[in-house]
Amino acid sequence: MRAGWTPRGFSAFHASLLPGRHPYLAHLGPRDRGARIGSRAYSQGCCSCLWLTYKGKKEGSTKGELGPAAVTDLEIPSYSRGFLPCTPRFPTTWCRGPGCFCGTAVIAGNLGDLARIVGPSHHASQLLLLQEQDSGNHPTMAESLSEISDSLDVLEAGDEGKKKCKFKALKSFFVKKKEKEAEDTQEEEMLELSLSSSNINISSLQPVRENQPTKARAKSSMGSKALSHDSIFMLGPEPERSASKMFPSMDPQRGRPQQRSHISRTLPKPRSKVPGVVSGAMSGAVLQNVPTSAVWVAGPKITENPPSRRRRLSIIPPVIQPEIISKNLVEISLDDESPKNPQKKALPHKSLTATQSFSELSSGPDCSQSLTAFATLASTSSTQLPIGFSTPATTQGCLDSSAARHKMTLNPRKQKKNLQVIIRGLPVWFSHFQGILEGSLQCVTQTLETPNLDEPLPVEPKEEEPNLPLVSEEEKSITKPKEINEKKLGMDSADSSSQKQNNKTEMYDKKTTDQAPNTDASRSQGYPMSAAYGRRWRRKGASVSGLSGCEFKGRSLKQSSEGYGLGDRAGSSPTNKTARNVPFSHLSLEKDNMEQPTTSQPETTTPQGLLSDKDDMGRRNAGIDFGSRKASAAQPIPENMDNSMVSDPQPYHEDAASGAEKTEARASLSLMVESLSTTQEEAILSVAAEAQVFMNPSHIQLEDQEAFSFDLQKAQSKMESAQDVQTICKEKPSGNVHQTFTASVLGMTSTTAKGDVYAKTLPPRSLFQSSRKPDAEEVSSDSENIPEEGDGSEELAHGHSSQSLGKFEDEQEVFSESKSFVEDLSSSEEELDLRCLSQALEEPEDAEVFTESSSYVEKYNTSDDCSSSEEDLPLRHPAQALGKPKNQQEVSSASNNTPEEQNDFMQQLPSRCPSQPIMNPTVQQQVPTSSVGTSIKQSDSVEPIPPRHPFQPWVNPKVEQEVSSSPKSMAVEESISMKPLPPKLLCQPLMNPKVQQNMFSGSEDIAVERVISVEPLLPRYSPQSLTDPQIRQISESTAVEEGTYVEPLPPRCLSQPSERPKFLDSMSTSAEWSSPVAPTPSKYTSPPWVTPKFEELYQLSAHPESTTVEEDISKEQLLPRHLSQLTVGNKVQQLSSNFERAAIEADISGSPLPPQYATQFLKRSKVQEMTSRLEKMAVEGTSNKSPIPRRPTQSFVKFMAQQIFSESSALKRGSDVAPLPPNLPSKSLSKPEVKHQVFSDSGSANPKGGISSKMLPMKHPLQSLGRPEDPQKVFSYSERAPGKCSSFKEQLSPRQLSQALRKPEYEQKVSPVSASSPKEWRNSKKQLPPKHSSQASDRSKFQPQMSSKGPVNVPVKQSSGEKHLPSSSPFQQQVHSSSVNAAARRSVFESNSDNWFLGRDEAFAIKTKKFSQGSKNPIKSIPAPATKPGKFTIAPVRQTSTSGGIYSKKEDLESGDGNNNQHANLSNQDDVEKLFGVRLKRAPPSQKYKSEKQDNFTQLASVPSGPISSSVGRGHKIRSTSQGLLDAAGNLTKISYVADKQQSRPKSESMAKKQPACKTPGKPAGQQSDYAVSEPVWITMAKQKQKSFKAHISVKELKTKSNAGADAETKEPKYEGAGSANENQPKKMFTSSVHKQEKTAQMKPPKPTKSVGFEAQKILQVPAMEKETKRSSTLPAKFQNPVEPIEPVWFSLARKKAKAWSHMAEITQ
């Protein structure tokens, strides 16, 4: 140690080391000190804090084992996440980095002589050693150290196995200590901190009491955070107090009750002086003999204990949970001398309930260093701390909690700051502490200063503290101090005493005596009730305190934002700060509340206790981290702290107001709690029926949570976060807010969390109110009346809708898997810094705890996205309407009619009516699945409210689909769909009809239909109509009937009916609807294309996870345009095999919806037709709508759905599709793309989604592009779909031609597998931006691909149908013939993203093989059709390339679409002809390419990645937003390139790399398509590679080659970005590099033969499309330039291909 300290393995420091020296606190560095000292340093903790376990005289002891206990030996753990397990074993939830304050002041020897505390500790970990001159205590200390050594050894072992058995090791250690100290074990019960990951059961070093035989040894489970920050070991100079051991975490002093009482007496003095410091935040041992010797280092506070009284005071941050400790603390609290009694922990497992409450209290505070805020209060309440050695451990681990709270009071910003706190002349430097904020530190400094602490913490009376001992809440009422302590105890019990103490400190200022036990109980409840306004709190208490915490938090923030407005959320910074400071204290408080809730508290307590001991340990740590993040995200929202909140609890604490502000906020909160306790009671009474119902549901929820086995944990975490929100609510009291919370509680725990999301998501007060109303309805899934009541109460406050949102979210979380939600939430949280977003994040955290943290977070991310959209959309009425429909949906689970009525009511609303109806259908849709699913949907729909009414409808369909498939998907998709809502109010009427549809049909069908109806609203009525047929497919005649009901709605209502018929159509017969759609004019064609894609996705019935990912992607896409919004809806639909399909179709329709009201009428007619369940009627309805320009789109969507289900119908519609209007087709295409992504795994969907989102901002086509991706992902191979989607998006920007090419590719993929349809949609999307004709051609292409089962017929029909689109029929034919190529393309696209590629390659490998055999023939036979595409390409160059399949692309590119690409294609094809010879007879460009594809099937397989990259590059070009996505797509493409390279050849890989380079510039896809044309050589090399590639060596080689090719291609991206001419030059260079790489590949041909076969087909298809696209976009001259270098390469490749083709033949076979 510094100052010449000699390392002795010195967790225990030998006083003899400095016998004559002036006692001082030596700072132990976290790592270097440990290294120098030779002690074992655990730097893996929060910061580089090392757990310095120095024992005995073993200087080099890494383990810190005690040698023979020396009188001077003292164990001094460096502060890190709890002294004991600061590190690896206990990931620091509090201490996030070196900046966190981890210093632990250990005072050894007689602290009376303590002269000074050494300066600031090493950033995060500082060990302050106070060495006393008097070493008389050392023998006792040595004895205690001997005991400690054993315990520490056990703990050390636990630390080594930190992640495995930290509690087990501690347990065993405590057991040993118990055996050693039977008396003390009885007297001092081991307290177990229940911190999910940070809780550490630490047996405190028990200094052997010289006078007392009792060995103070208590198992002290301390949150590593609290310990790491708050732990201070204060040893009394007396041998007994010398025995007052220092424990790595809070020292659980196991002294006799006498000792404890004595210590308590000693502690009250310090508490009166620095009660908060010693009792709460200062988790270190308190010097007992030295009045100034007591040093509290953990939270920057320092407490001085009177030196006259030596006590082994182990200040355990609010970790004291077991009842045994409660007993011990009762004794201690009698003395009220040791605010560190919380360190004493009774058997954590023996008294589970007490431990649960304690763990809840202490773990929340300990885990969340926001407890440091309470630590500040606890410093005041340290005197109040009932925790004493003589007092049994109670839920009031006030001392420990105080430490944690105090640190929480210290804002994270203060972590980096060194705060010099002078306590009785003791300057203590606190290095930046994670939980310390500057303001908090200032407050702490004031608090730490004896006068200041007393002032800020008026509840600190020394005398009172002895009366306030932690006496298991019995002594609470003994005196005011006791009552205050009880209040704190209640808060601590519910939320670790320190949190409560912090609140009580202020409350004590206001109502110290009044609130005693009652206030304590009501505070444990009422504090959250302050935020929840009693009712909600009670419900939460009944169901889960954690949920209420999250609910409160969200609503409190919402209330603040409502009071101040979204912009005012920053204005509510004091409240937010309070919430931030309180949140962790609230976390434990929540838990305490869960124990204390009037009726449900016992239920909650027991399961939570178990969860606290079991899951809460690991989960609460994560929950606390997440909770701190949540608090940070939610509370900083008012302060624009979303980023910091989301990112880290530190920002949360940083953003937390200064300690003074916190104190003020707490004081106001205390007043609010007092008033709210009454208000809560009143609210509970007013919502009595709801509350009762809710309480029953809360029990039910508890059961459900138990079923989930982590619901209680989630509820606890939610309560914790809700505590923070409650603090905010208290700061900003609002009867409406209380009512709102009550209504949210009415909903359920999950509803509560969702309510928070709503509050955050719905900035408008009116919107919030509307949302809250539906929340009540959601809560009353069992009885509609109750939810209605909840609605009435929730309407009072603006945050009601957010409350209902929270409900849904909670339910959704419970229903769905939490992992995906967590992922989405994390991304969303980070992405969305908006206050609303952070608020939503807070809720998801709670939900996360409720089910799985990950799942809810993912969902929450969706909410965040919605929040951002809400912020973007200032509309309040829509949000309100949305909130109501959600409630109605939930109620509809009980009775569908009620949701309809609610929908009607919402519709009746003047300006909010449209959005409200939308919300209602959503609620109904959700209800059928389950209350949880409903909650998810509702919360999502609530979030979109702020943006637009249309946006809301989109949210609902997604939610429904997700509910059908799985809660997880629902949550994610829901938030995605919410984003699309912003477009228009059209969605509102649509949502209402949808709701009716859902109500009309089965609950599930209703949900799906409603969702679908909502989704189409955003884009246009025509999209809605398209959506309706799809919905029909899912919910048969019932959905149609509902659609009919919707018809009465205004013009928008017309679109609603259309959606319903669609839904029924999807349900009953997608094929049938497809056939009726066929007659639809070209305009209609576009929507049908979308629908078939969705239907294809239906067939695949993607996983919920992939749906979730897609939704996230969708969200990103939706933000830019309505099309992207529709895409999100489609994704959601895809999730459920049945409902997903219907929803997807609805979404597809939804994307066309934006066109016009005609679509609405079309939907209406469709609904009627579906009611009759006649396909002809549906077709007629489409025809009827055909007069309307956008109706055709809807009918065409139906037609597309039919095509998907029936190849013949798909072929028929292919012709019809071509006429689709350019705009509508783009929308429908967008949806398919999104769906494509949805199909794939969440991982693959996410990359696509990212690309999609980025591209969406560019234009609606890009947005629509995002959708098709999702369907493709959802469909069969999500991996391939993302790459393809990226390619399509990129192609969009370059040219319609490239888009058209992409679209055929997509279709081809759909034909071999449903996945191909998403690809087609991508193509459509890409076509959209260029022109309408290209879109139509894309659709026709998709149709043939979709009907790949009958490839020949389909391509022909589509060719004829798309003839007006020059490139449609050729591409369609090619697509039909080369369905395998579509699959191959898809594989290539998948290869663009490695994850997708891996999953899809396997599926497509078989298909590719099949197609490679039968696909080569079609390719060969297609040369003529390819020539047609060439011709068509000439007319609409871009379109032609787009519509063409792989061959079509090549042909089109070769034909020269009117762009230079054709020339390049021709040149490439000429090269191909030269190389292959077999294909040379083809049309100069197309035939050559086809020959190349046939011959160089493997080469083409490798090529696709290049074209895809080009496409992505184009998308990049198109818009800056696309660029980000393109980057993601480019990365995906590169990844897929790796996969393709692995399967194909090194050149293919290099090609992929080069193409991504080109891709980045965003040149038109056509240009890159030229590359694709030259890629057949690469394909040949890929084939060769694949033979030898089975080992990944070829991939590396390809990478190397691609680097060489990338150099040449690097220019090409630039040129591509510049223009087609530029592209040609890079292509030439790229071609050259391709040739070189191909040569290299020739050397590597044997690597992956099988892969080559599969990939060759795949590449053939994808590169053909891409090449055509590139050629169409690239000037012929440009392409010709590359042709020259390519020819030599082709010749070389001709040889290689001879080999490669032989390999391909083998692979294909």
UniProtKB/Swiss-Prot annotation:
Quaternary structure and partners: Interacts with TOP2B.
Biased composition (Polar residues): 494-505, 514-527, 886-941, 1288-1299, 1332-1350, 1366-1376, 1457-1469
Protein name: Acrosomal protein KIAA1210
Lineage, highest ranks first: Eukaryota, Metazoa, Chordata, Craniata, Vertebrata
InterPro entries: CRACD-like (IPR026713), DUF4592 (IPR028030)
Compositionally biased residues, Basic residues: 257-272
Listed Acidic residues bias regions: 777-794
An example Gene Ontology CC term for this record: acrosomal vesicle
Localization terms from the record: Cytoplasmic vesicle, Secretory vesicle, Acrosome
Biased composition (Low complexity): 595-608, 1502-1513
Sequence segments annotated as region (Disordered): 207-226, 239-275, 451-663, 763-973, 1211-1382, 1408-1516, 1539-1571, 1589-1653
This protein's UniProt keywords: Cytoplasmic vesicle
